[in-house]
Design a protein with these regions (language model features):
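Alpha-helical subdomain
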Residues: 1-70, 163-166, 170-336
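Conserved Class I S-adenosyl-L-methionine-dependent methyltransferase catalytic core
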Residues: 6-27, 32-33, 38, 47, ...
Length: 336
């Protein structure tokens, strides 16, 4: 057994401080301001309307995190820091805000979730996603964060999905949010059209994204609850949906999808695979944290490949291929 490393453990314990520092950087507009022009702490404080000394202390912390760089007294963003600023290209600013605000309180209940096996939504009798329909601000923050995470993996995952599509057809993105992955798939498959199916709160964002991508005439947007049924299609796509839900709810959703598939249709689920024996690797740590995030929220989980195969079988679906992508996700192909 390796010797104890108290400093490493302290870094893990204090990880919550890092989350809040990054969230504050977005919330105060510091990343946006520095993206326009590097500047000293006093000038930045005037632009952001913050205290000069406190701003300097936050900037010092951001340098230590590799988010900012300092030359003399002038601070600027590193490449990672630019992911916290608004603008075109990859971004994680929405995720930083969601992690620091929307997910903060639920994580306080992790011990209770481990005691009971229930997420805080189940304990409170609330449906997390249904609640978003009545909270425009929370819904916008959630969908922005989800869109950012999807954009990071859309390229390699869409290439795999596109390779499964031949000729013409109809693909339904179930729980598709703003439709970013569907848009990436359809960009290289002009013979196909699609539908984004999600809760009502996602509709406006989907309309905007599809219009910007020039796909408004090829993609319909339908609002609803996928546990009640899903639109019919030749291909049904589920990206990071099954991990939200426990086995009973996931099996019901898969049965709804199986019922909606056209003859000889297929279901494609984009998920990450939990390793049989996780270790102290960055990818494993990220996946295990996500697994706990699902536990404390809607009650879902990350699954191993055998667990996915058993789950799909309960819905009358057979997994015929599991294709890894360069983005760390796999594309699970299943058929009735």
């Amino acid at each position: 057994m390796p010797a104890a490393d108290p400093q490493r453990l302290l870094e893990l314990i204090n990880g919550c401080w890092t989350t809040q520092a990054l969230c504050a950087t977005v919330e105060l507009g510091i990343a946006d301001t520095l993206a326009d022009q590097p500047m000293d702490a006093a000038t930045l404080a005037r632009c952001a309307g913050t205290d000069s000394q406190a701003t300097a202390r936050l900037l010092r912390a951001l340098v230590s995190l590799g988010v900012c760089e300092c030359h003399g007294t002038v601070y600027g963003l590193t490449a990672n820091g630019r992911l916290l600023a608004a603008g075109p290209g990859p971004s994680l600013r929405g995720w930083a805000t969601l992690a620091g605000r929307g997910l903060w309180a639920p994580w306080h209940g992790l011990a209770d979730s481990v005691r009971t096996g229930l997420g805080h939504h189940a304990r409170d009798g609330h449906d997390r996603f249904e609640a978003l329909d009545g909270d425009a601000e929370a819904a916008s923050a959630f969908q922005q964060a989800m869109s950012e995470l999807t954009a990071l993996i859309a390229g390699p995952v869409a290439a795999i999905i596109g390779g499964r599509l031949v000729g013409t057809g109809h693909i339904v993105d179930v729980g598709g949010g703003h439709g970013g992955l569907l848009a990436a798939v359809l960009a290289s498959r002009p013979g196909w059209h699609g539908t984004v199916f999600d809760r009502p709160h996602a509709r406006a964002g989907a309309e905007r994204l599809l219009r910007e991508e020039g796909l408004a005439d090829r993609v319909a947007i339908i609002s609803g609850n996928f546990f009640d049924g899903v639109p019919a299609g030749d291909v049904l796509l589920l990206k990071s949906v099954l991990h939200d839900w426990g086995d009973n709810c996931s099996a019901l959703l898969l049965r709804r999808c199986a019922d909606a598939l056209s003859p000889r249709g297929m279901l494609l689920a984009v998920e990450r695979l939990m390793p049989e024996a996780p270790s102290d690797l960055p990818a494993h740590r990220a996946l295990c944290r996500s697994d706990l995030n699902m536990l404390i929220g809607p009650g879902g989980c990350e699954r191993t490949e055998p667990e996915f195969r058993a789950l799909f079988a309960t819905a009358g679906l057979s997994i015929v291929a599991v294709t890894p992508s360069a983005a760390g996700f796999v594309v699970i192909e299943a058929r009735p």
